[in-house]
Amino acid sequence: MQIYQPHPWPLTVEEAITIQEELRHQVITEDQFTQPVQYVAGVDMGFEADGTISRAAVAVLSFPDLQVIETNLAYRPTSFPYIPGFLSFREIPAVLDALAKVQTKPDIILCDGQGIAHPRRLGIASHLGVLLNIPTIGVAKSLLIGKHEELADTKGSWQPLIHRGEIIGAVLRTRVGVKPVYVSSGHKISLPTAIDYVLRCTPKYRLPETTRVADKLASNR
């Protein structure tokens, strides 16, 4: 897969902030993709050798039946420290290496992390989407920023996630009696559509099947 918006990878937080502030203005939070969707992908990360080696996994699944079509792994030295709010700079270089091996181009990528639900509105899903010019969705297991009202226990229930008066995502129940996930637009997809695809990719478990397959690969399980 071709990188649409390449940039140098920063060595400092200050450089990373500059890149985030530049790229955030290129994020599109409206639906700009061809339907029907045929393939969805998940990306996830693992680390080896005390975090010095990054192991990125990508899984491409058919849609809507969610059968695994293709998986790939890529390894590279970790070049950026673990700092909340800047995880894309630590993870995306290896993710791009894994995606470069993909033969079946996905229509949408679901990322294990944030989209615009990020202090500078550029979490890993938005960052990756802008770089690849492809629709992406952030599906995070934990809250980074924002507040929301109490959520009903039924599957499919959701509440808007609000930060500084702006709706930046949704807290979404994907399974009855289980912790919710935090969904946000990554790139080229609206929040209602992102919620719809996340629900359609979570037929049995809390996390999307795309994430589950990629996580097993990245974790070497």
Swiss-Prot record:
Keywords: Cytoplasm, DNA damage, DNA repair, Endonuclease, Hydrolase, Magnesium, Metal-binding, Nuclease. InterPro entries: Endonuclease-V. One of its GO terms (molecular function) is magnesium ion binding. CDD domains: Endonuclease_V. Gene3D superfamilies: archaeoglobus fulgidus dsm 4304 superfamily. The record marks Y82 as: Interaction with target DNA. It catalyses: Endonucleolytic cleavage at apurinic or apyrimidinic sites to products with a 5'-phosphate. GO terms for biological process: DNA repair. Its EC number is 3.1.21.7. DNA repair enzyme involved in the repair of deaminated bases. Selectively cleaves double-stranded DNA at the second phosphodiester bond 3' to a deoxyinosine leaving behind the intact lesion on the nicked DNA. PANTHER family: ENDONUCLEASE V (PTHR28511:SF1). This is Endonuclease V. The gene is nfi.
